[in-house]
Amino acid sequence: MTQQQAQTHVATEGDREIVTERVFDAPRERVFQAFVDPELIPQWWGRRADTTTVDKMDVREGGEWRFVTDGPDGNTAFRGVYRAVEPPERLEQTFEWEGMPGHIVVETATFEDLGDGRTKVSTRSLFHTTEERDGMLASGMEIGLGESYEQLDELLAAGAAVD
């Protein structure tokens, strides 16, 4: 299964994974910074109709993160633990929607310097079961991810992230 949301490529791999790719028109260091800076996260993370608040963001191995989104459908929270932080190449973390506690996903994001001022971000999300993976896809995550990445494009174009 392969689907396209804006320029974000989303595919399933194996029985329990979702793999995404997106190319950003910015150097790798700037893109990585946007993923780890608590002041930048609220400017791009989540759907356009939502407001994101960073409740906790301790970007180090073993550090915790928690984001709360508030929008037309109410508020919800997501949380996890950073398992690996390797600037500007790789982030690995757990991801859990507090509305379904115990369904923890392991997400690995890699940041590839394409050599022309652009960066490819690839994420691999590993679920416990095929049903959990398929439930995430059915939840509208592709729309939310697409909107988030569009907002990140805009943020990077405005020069908001650190060089």
Over which residues does each language-model region extend?
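Hydrophobic pocket/interface hotspot
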Residues: 31-35, 41, 65-67, 82, ...
